[in-house]
Amino acid sequence: MKKALIIGGGGFIGSNITQFLLENRDYSIDVIDNFSRSVGGKTPILEKYRDSERLKILNLDLTKLENFDQLNRDYDYVFMLAAMVGVDKVNAVPHEVIRVNSMLLLNTLEWLKASSCGRVVF
């Protein structure tokens, strides 16, 4: 069984990749998200599979590098899909959007550098 990490897995693309891999491939999947855009901290697609033994969902803020310590370091695939998005958000707090998105990318790259992960998809 292959292992995948989906950073930003609570969003539209991430949750659909999760669904596809669970339904069509033999993968164990860790989904990481802060779920700031979901209703009540839940994403319908992820809720459908919450009890799957092949799915682990973590609510983490990856702008803090130490939170990466909770992850494995040997995923076959890493999907980096996390970002603060939305025109309203960008217009309201542009500096915060840049800070958060920069830290997400920087911390992910630092963690990948110290890991033995296979392929990375951005």
Language-model features: locations:
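Structural signature of the Rossmann-like NAD(P)-dependent dehydrogenase/reductase core
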Residues: 6-7, 80, 119-122
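Surface-exposed alpha-helical interface segments used for non-catalytic interactions
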Residues: 19, 103-106
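Conserved NAD(P)H cofactor-binding loop of Rossmann-fold oxidoreductase domains
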Residues: 81-85
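Short alpha-helical oligomerization interface
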Residues: 87-104
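Conserved Rossmann-fold NAD(P)-dependent oxidoreductase catalytic core, especially the SDR/UDP-sugar
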Residues: 106-122
